[in-house]
Structure formats: C-alpha cells, structure tokens
Amino acid sequence: MPTAFSRRSLLAAGLSLGLLAAGSAQAADWCASKPVKFAGVNWESGMLLTELMGFVLQHGYDCKVDSIPGNSITLEQALANDDIQVFAEEWIGRSEAWNKAAAAGKVVGVGAPIEGATEGWYVPRYLVEGEGAKAPNLKTIADLGQYAELFRDPEEPGKGRFYNCPAGWTCELENTQMLQSYGLSDKYTNFRPGTGPALDAAIVSATKRKQPILTYYWSPTPLLGRVDMVQLKPRDGEAKRIQVQAGLSKAFHDGAPELVAVLSRVNVPIELLNRTLAEQAEAKQDAPTTAKALLKAHPELWQAWVTDAAARNKIQAAL
C-alpha cells in the first residue's frame, strides 16, 4: 500500500504524464488536420532555418510541412491571414506589413533563431584601407555624396550605382528611403538586382577585379565570410537594433503550443551558421541537404530544441 509521500509522487507522475500526453495531442491535433506551411523565403539563412524547423516538425511530430514561395511582404501578409503559419527568419520591426499585423494581434514572434545579425551599406576593404586605396576618407554613408564618380553606373555614367536589395524585399524599401534621406537620390541610381544570387554575383565579380562597388548587405550570409567588406557608418542614432525571431500566425501560435515551444527554442550560433552557409555555397548544396547534414553533425542543437523523448528518437532515426 503506497505511503502518503508515494501517493503524492504517483499523483505528480500522473499529472506529468498527462501534461506530456496533452502536449503531444496538441501537436497531433494540428498536424492531423492541416499542414504547417512555411514562408518560402529566398535568402540563404532563411532557407536553411526553414528547412531545419521543417525537418524537426516533420520527422519529430509527424507534421506535413510545406513551403510557399513569395517575396517578404507578400509572405508576411499571408502569415497575418494564417495562409502560412511560420516565417522562420523574421527581422522584427523591419516591415510595415509585420508591424501592422503584430499591432492587430495577427502574428506573434517567438524565440531567437539567430543572434548577432547585422546589416548595412558596404564597400570592399581594399577601396578604403591599405596601400592604393582609392577612398581612404570614405567612412560613413553621409560621405557618399563626394564619391558618386568612384561608383559610376555603366548605364548612367553621370551617377554612381548603389546596389539595393531585390524588389519586394523589405530592405529594398528602407534603402530607397535612406537614399532620399541622405540626399543621394540625384547622385546614385537605385539599382535593384532581380534576386539575392544576382546581388551576390555582382559583388563577387567586382571584388575579384578589385573594382569599386557600393552595396547593401547583411549577416548571416556565406558571402561576408568569403569577401572582405567594410560597413559604412550611419548617422548617430540610426544604427539598428536587430532582433530575429520565428514569426508565427496567431492561429498557429494558439493552436499548437507544443510545436510553438519547439520553434521558440530553435537557435543556431551565428559563427556556425555563417560557416555552414559558406560550406553550402562552396559545395553547391541545396538547403534541405545542408539542413540534414547540420542536424546530423550537431545533435546538441536539435536536442536542445526538442525535449520530448519520442520526438527525439524519431528525428534521430530520420537522420
């Protein structure tokens, strides 16, 4: 016959098992009736995080996962409408679409999949430092008005060329506003490459030939691990605090708490992320292949995200 202590222990154990069962049921309830749709973003770190999260939900929790392509603004609007459920790499506060949806209670940011992210306007280091530097006094964005000739646009030789983000990215709108606020719109063309890889190709081509180039860029990325670039300083008070979270639809956030708890724990150290992205680019691998290899090589990552023993076993078996 159990003692009072053992009865309490059994009761506590029963409650714990009940909570675990309830959590599993919550995940099963969502995934039994509908898929988890991810934003099909088109930049490297976002694609990798999408695959990491999707792999864990698919193999650990038997979810059907899908990725819906589109540009950032369209996908954030889809998130607000619960047409998709997860935006794996949401730069919080950057997008008006996100800000409006968050204020209306339609989206929720959780976790910190990336910490230490950066962004800004960059030039090659050889342009501003070292022997033969053509612009040793170029330090800030405000200085650029004096250097339009250095960054001459081959299609409009009377202006310099600024390489913006592809059209449809949130940063494209912000950079356009910055060109105007710094009085650079009349001195530089606002060149928008068609895709992220096209922007990378322009930077790599210029730096291989030691040519001047002025571009927006960000980290984590494989490119900044391979090309030595210097970030130009913005005006005082304009440096941005970057917070990256997993963006969730409110319906998913409220309807699948166990899955949300997993996504809120997803984090890849930025040094490992940059190194992995560089290796992916070098090997010409796709994001699903890289994600699986990363999870296999670093079980300490996903084991910190997934606390359920049964889910862990299924993920391990899938690797």
Where do the PLM segments sit?
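Ligand-binding pocket segment of bilobal, Venus flytrap-like solute-binding proteins
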Residues: 78, 84-88, 164-234
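An extracytoplasmic/periplasmic, membrane-proximal ligand-sensing/linker region
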Residues: 45, 169-189, 194-200, 204-208, ...
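A bilobed periplasmic-binding-protein/Venus flytrap-type ligand-binding module shared by bacterial periplasmic
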Residues: 120-132, 242-256, 279
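Pocket-flanking alpha-helical
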Residues: 50, 68-106, 202, 222-228
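Short, well-ordered beta-strand elements
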Residues: 30-45, 63-68, 159-163, 263
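Short, polar/charged alpha-helical segment
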Residues: 44-63, 177-180
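Immediate post-signal peptide segment of exported/extracytoplasmic ligand-binding proteins
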Residues: 25-38, 151-159, 303-305, 319
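A conserved helix-loop-strand patch within extracytoplasmic ligand-binding domains
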Residues: 107-163
